[in-house]
Amino acid sequence: MENANKPTFQNVLEFVRTFRRKNKLQREIADVEKKIRDNQKRVLLLDNLSDYIKPGMSVEAIQAIIADMRGNYEDRVDEYIIKNADLSKERRDLSKKLKALGEGEYKEEK
């Protein structure tokens, strides 16, 4: 009887290892994609900055351009923080709903 369960247990262990590896790869891929996007944005930012800065501009004019760009980016960050909070709240609400649904099914089985 024990021998009959052993291959099944090994199959379960292999499934768990494979599933964990797949999840780890997904996280690593997402991390690398984020790094690619971040660096592409940096390149674009430098290109945009080069378009604004002209020969003979004063240091004050360049600083004003940078300050304006910084303000715009800070506004975007604030918007994304608010959006992320809204999404997190919705995720928590769905988790509570799923938990309640799961508990309801468990009670019905008894």
UniProtKB/Swiss-Prot annotation:
Coiled-coil intervals: 15-42
InterPro entries in alphabetical order: DUF496 (IPR007458), UPF0265 (IPR053375)
Compartment(s) where it occurs, according to its Swiss-Prot or TrEMBL record: Cytoplasm
Keyword match Coiled coil: yes
GO CC annotations, alphabetized: cytosol
Keyword annotations: Coiled coil, Cytoplasm
Annotated function: Pole-localizer protein involved in the regulation of several cellular processes.
Protein name per UniProt: Pole-localizer protein TmaR
UniProt organism field: Edwardsiella ictaluri (strain 93-146)
The organism's taxonomic lineage, starting at the top: Bacteria, Pseudomonadati, Pseudomonadota, Gammaproteobacteria, Enterobacterales
Name of the coding gene: tmaR
